[in-house]
Design a protein with these regions (language model features):
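Disulfide-braced loops of extracellular cysteine-rich modules
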Residues: 124-136
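Short, disulfide-bonded extracellular cysteine-rich repeat modules
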Residues: 134-146
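Surface-exposed short loop/turn segments
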Residues: 150-152, 159-160, 165-166, 175-247
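Short secondary-structure boundary motifs at beta->alpha junctions and helix caps
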Residues: 247-298
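Short, solvent-exposed mixed-charge patches
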Residues: 302-304
């Protein structure tokens, strides 16, 4: 009997400690949210609304703000970037799921003039804490200064601690070990990732969006396949591009054009993966060239 009583007492004591730790972690999260949510949530709401708007309907009315294009060259400025399939622009949930796999690609490299260093030159890392001041641990597990434009995938990941989902995960943590893991992740994010994310979001002057349509005859992208669906980007396809100036929420560019290029010359490539990567790069650069021509004064290409 004494053993049973002792066991119950120990269990209740452990549960009390877990609950105390849970409430302490949630209090720390509320303090962070109180400071950062007013900066992040309005911007997130704006870019998600723009993304849904650009993806809506079968037609896209071409638009260029001539004055902004003439006097405000965004290509050497700090900005935000997101690339999704058009199916992932259907609603907020789809955008957030797709953003988890959105990466910088040949489109930004060919369009913008940001002096980014190679993502492979830094030392190996497991998390941002392993890197120097101003550096983060990138998707290649290398320390590097955040590249421009800043991919919204990283912002969504870093600022996940402000979300209702994070609070639910904390409420549902079953025991001490799970709560310790959440606490450790929270501390790493607050110490290492949030300062960089907030700085880049604060400095951003534009939002650049690409929505890839499915190639003719191809099945639509579903779930969180995102721009990582290589087959979609390798084939010729139509894409929608939007550009917004963040200071006044002004639409600067809206267009739909074909992302398609023919590789000419060079050595014959027999490796299918290498050939596919080259074709994706060429298609993305062709898309960037079309955007550049519109910005420089050409008419937006009408939809077929």
């Amino acid at each position: 009997m004494a053993l049973v009583v002792a066991t119950i007492f120990h269990w209740k004591r452990s549960q009390g400690q877990v609950e105390s730790a849970r409430q302490g972690l949630k209090a720390r999260q509320r303090a962070v949210a109180q400071e950062l949510a007013p900066r992040w949530l309005p911007m997130r709401q704006a870019v998600e609304a723009w993304t849904i708007e650009l993806g809506r309907g079968a037609e896209v009315e071409p638009f260029v703000d001539a004055e902004a294009a003439r006097h405000w060259d965004f290509r050497d400025k700090a900005g935000l970037y997101l690339r999704l399939s058009i199916e992932q622009a259907a609603d907020v949930a789809a955008i957030r799921a797709g953003a988890k796999k959105s990466l910088r690609d040949g489109f930004t490299a060919c369009l913008l003039r940001a002096p980014n260093e190679s993502p492979l030159v830094g030392k190996e890392c497991a998390r941002t804490r392993d890197c120097g001041v101003g550096e983060s641990c990138n998707e290649l597990d290398r320390c590097a200064r955040p590249a421009q434009p800043y991919n919204l995938r990283v912002a969504y990941r870093s600022l996940q601690v402000l979300s209702d989902e994070w609070v639910r995960d904390t409420d549902n943590a079953a025991g001490e070990l799970e709560l310790r893991m959440l606490t450790s992740s929270f501390e790493d994010t607050v110490r290492d990732d949030l300062p960089i994310a907030v700085d880049l979001l604060t400095r951003a002057q534009y939002f650049l969006l690409v929505l890839d349509e499915a190639p003719s005859g191809a099945p639509p992208v579903v779930g969180d396949a995102g721009v990582g669906d290589d087959a979609q980007l390798t084939a010729p396809h139509w894409a929608r591009v939007g550009l917004w100036r963040l200071s006044d929420r002004k639409l600067v560019l809206r267009m739909r054009t074909e992302a398609s290029a023919t590789l000419v010359g060079g050595a014959t490539v027999t490796d299918a993966d290498v050939a596919g990567a080259r074709q994706r790069q060429a298609n993305s650069c062709a898309l960037a060239g079309a955007v550049r021509r519109v910005i420089e004064g050409a008419d937006a290409q009408p939809a077929p």
